[in-house]
Structures are given as structure tokens and as C-alpha cells.
Amino acid sequence: MLFRPKPTPCLKDMTEGRTELARAKVNLTLHVGASIQSGKWRGYHPLESLVVFANFGDTLSFKPSRNGTMEFEGPFGEVLCDQENNSIWDALELAKAPPHDTTIDKQIPIAAGLGGGTADAAAVLRAFDPNRKIHPIKIGADGPVCHLSRTAMMEGIGEVVSPLPGLGQISAVLVNPNVAVSTGAVFNAMDSRLRDENPAMTARDGSLLSRALSGTNDMQDFAIAQVPIINDVLRALAQATGCELARMSGSGATCFGIFRSDAQATAAANAISQAQEGWWVRACRLGDDVQDIVT
């Protein structure tokens, strides 16, 4: 699947190609305040979120070339192949990247609450803006935390990111019913109910699981109202042996289940896959252990 993007301005060239892994993002908690009514961030929603990253993601490969092409591979590559405007191209323009042949192995579902598009854009910035002259908030609210790509607390409108090293990993299953959710529509539904600009707070100490259990995803009920099958996904995860928490990530529709062990997570993923052949299901680890990151 190949298309040729618009030419990019050539400021400098890299003599060798490079590869970046855009890890899937999961919001273990997501608290949302009422939209800001004045100032620089007027119209944005203040957020507070405990964010972790999976041990898989999209792989972006860049190779210097004269004109530059973009090729999508993987199970979700075909969805993006026909789109000239995508987050990767936008980030290449933002970074004023020189022409490269770019290959994207797309493993993260589209519009799924896993930050795939923003993670891809952040990977571009890591590759072509190593000195961080461009603030990652320019690629979206998830931009700064996806640029870090490590366990962190995200606050403000997403521009405040506090790394949380040393919390390790948890076993998990991610499930998406192959239904897209409109983030804008969910926020619009929330706006009629939100009154306080100050979002709730996640616990600041304890394990990843205990911190996750201390909070909620404020977008979950609103997303379910629009896409009821999300509730079926949550039920399937919650009923699986060893599941300690089932919750939606981001604005959905992907949900995660936290399990006591990798073995229980794998068993749950296999059972859900067999029961729901049309769903995307993946057992993984969430959190930071670089040696376990796979592509």
C-alpha cells in the first residue's frame, strides 16, 4: 500500500535510516473537567490521567530518499492508505523533515482510544526534532505523554507530564469491538453535564493497579451511550478469570482488563477472541520494561 505525499522542505538530511516504535497508549484513569472559559486554553478541557504504554505499537521506519514516499503495512494499514492527510504527514511537515521513504507497520487500531495517531506523530518528532524545538502539544493533547512514551501523570490540557519511573508492568488484555468512537462527540455530550473545571485526582502513591483503582474514566459512560457495545466489551473482560479491573481507555472504544498474571491474560484473550470473532483482542503488558517491548 503505497502513496507519494506532497514534497517536504529539505533543511537537512540523515545519512542513515532509523526506526521508531510508537507504543499504544492506555489511560488507566482519565478525569475530565469542564471546558476552560477564558485564557490561552479557552475551549479545551482540563485533564488528569494516569497513562501507561503497551509493549507493542506501530513501527515507523525512515530512509532518506530524493522524493519521499509513505507506505502502510500491518492489520490497520489499509485504513490509512487512502488518506493523504494523516497525523504522520502532519508531523513530518511540522518538523520540516527532509524527504524520506516512510514505512508504517500499523498495529494499533484506528480511532480506538489508544493514541495511535498521536503516538505515530510523536515518533516522527522524536526522529526529526531530537532537540525538542517543537512542543509536542502541537500534535494534540496526548502529544507530550506520547512523546515521552513512558508511564506518567498527564495534567493541564495534556501539556503537563510527570514521569513515574519504577512502577513496573502489569498484565493486561486490550479489546476493541472494531467500532470507532468520535472523541468530539463524547466531549460534546459531556459538556452539558460538566460544571467544575478541576478534574478528579488519581492516587499519587501505590502500585499501578492501586492507582488505577483509585480513579475512573469520566468519558466511559458517555461513550457507552453512543456506542453501547462498549458495555459488552467491559462485561466480557470483567467476567474473565483473574481480571482485577475492566475499564475503557481514552474516549474508546478500546477497553482494557488488568490481570494477575500473563497466563491469565493470555487465556482471557483467547477466550474472548473465540467468543467474538469480529473483535480485536490482544494480550500485552502495560508499563515500563524496555527489554520486553516488541514490535
Regions found by a protein language model. Give the residues of each.
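DPxDG-like acidic metal-binding loop motif
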Residues: 112-139, 145, 149
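Solvent-exposed alpha-helices and their adjacent loops that cap or buttress functional pockets
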Residues: 52-53, 138, 144-147, 163-168, ...
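Short beta-strand segments
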Residues: 29, 103-105, 138-140, 147, ...
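Phosphate-handling active-site elements
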Residues: 96-103, 126-141, 262-276
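Glycine-rich beta-strand-to-loop/alpha-helix junction loops that act as flexible
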Residues: 116-117, 248-253
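Short hydrophobic/aromatic beta-strand micro-patches
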Residues: 31, 256-258
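ATP-binding N-lobe of GHMP and related small-molecule kinases
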Residues: 2-112, 167, 176
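Conserved, helical-rich catalytic subdomain that frames metal- and/or nucleotide-binding sites
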Residues: 62, 70, 148-245, 260-266, ...
